[in-house]
């Protein structure tokens, strides 16, 4: 009888959950009968020799690796800060925040039952499941948020940044994941929801940055995510600073074209 590779990892106690198994597999350290395998859905015989070589993922999901890159490249420090993880899902970003010194994290998601058990039981985490960030008011959050990560799907960041801004303290920071497939017009999205055109990637980056600037977010940095989205989409990390003095910004992202080129060179191999 054959099983999916991610299921095999969980059954053999090589991963705590299917989500974590997928992350470990995608990190390129899983071998089946001596051959490296990086697709969680690949089917193998139950008797196959499955090995995890090297260090397993240090976060509850691969999302943590995205925020880790942003923190490293953007010089973000979270020690002692009150944070929010919008689109928390399993909690990879939340986990990364806590491991980097956050004292409190509001984990917000429209779904429910997804946040990893270890995070649910962490007194520093406020689990806000079944919650749409668009309708959260400052009165519901007793703290002013100092750092926000945003990783949402099936909605444009232009619908989310405004509500997030209302919850933040002056000079607070945001790292948002720009997903071209949810920002571009339908006519620009290819088969299986994948956007491959560099020009479209650049267009959506500039659109999101421009919108953010129009509501008082200053764009500080841009990088590409180290991991593709589930369908193979290249995604981008945009670093913003919250300004509350009425300023607006054009947010011409310097070097965006070069970052898009580098993303394709690195991830489309």
Positions of the model-derived regions?
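S-adenosyl-L-methionine
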Residues: 106-159
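A short glycine-rich, Lys/Arg-flanked "PGG" loop and its adjoining helix->strand segment in the class I
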Residues: 158-175
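Short, glycine-/aromatic-enriched active-site segment of Class I SAM-dependent methyltransferases
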Residues: 180-196
């Amino acid at each position: 009888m054959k099983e999916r590779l991610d299921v095999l990892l969980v059954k053999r106690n090589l991963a705590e959950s299917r989500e974590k198994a997928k992350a470990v597999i995608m990190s390129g350290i899983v071998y089946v009968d001596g051959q490296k395998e990086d697709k969680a859905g690949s089917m193998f015989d139950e008797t196959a020799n499955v090995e995890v070589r090297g260090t397993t993922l240090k976060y509850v999901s691969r999302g943590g690796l995205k925020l880790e890159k942003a923190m490293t490249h953007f010089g973000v420090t979270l020690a002692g800060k009150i944070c929010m993880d919008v689109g928390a899902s399993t909690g990879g970003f939340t986990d990364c925040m806590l491991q980097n010194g956050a004292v409190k994290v509001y984990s917000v998601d429209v779904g429910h039952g997804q946040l990893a058990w270890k995070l649910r039981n962490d007194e520093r985490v406020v689990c806000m499941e079944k919650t749409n960030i668009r309708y959260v008011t400052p009165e519901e959050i007793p703290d002013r948020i100092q750092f926000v990560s945003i990783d949402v799907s099936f909605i444009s960041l232009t619908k989310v940044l405004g509500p997030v801004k209302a919850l933040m303290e002056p000079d607070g920071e945001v790292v948002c994941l720009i997903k071209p497939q949810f920002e571009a017009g339908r006519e620009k999205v290819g088969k299986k929801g994948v956007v491959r055109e560099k020009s479209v990637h650049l267009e959506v980056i500039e659109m999101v940055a421009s919108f953010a600037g129009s509501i008082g977010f200053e764009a500080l940095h841009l990088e590409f995510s180290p991991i593709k989205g589930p369908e193979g989409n290249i995604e981008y990390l945009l670093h913003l600073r919250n300004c509350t003095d009425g300023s607006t910004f054009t947010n011409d992202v310097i070097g965006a074209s070069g970052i898009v080129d580098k993303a394709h060179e690195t991830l489309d191999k």
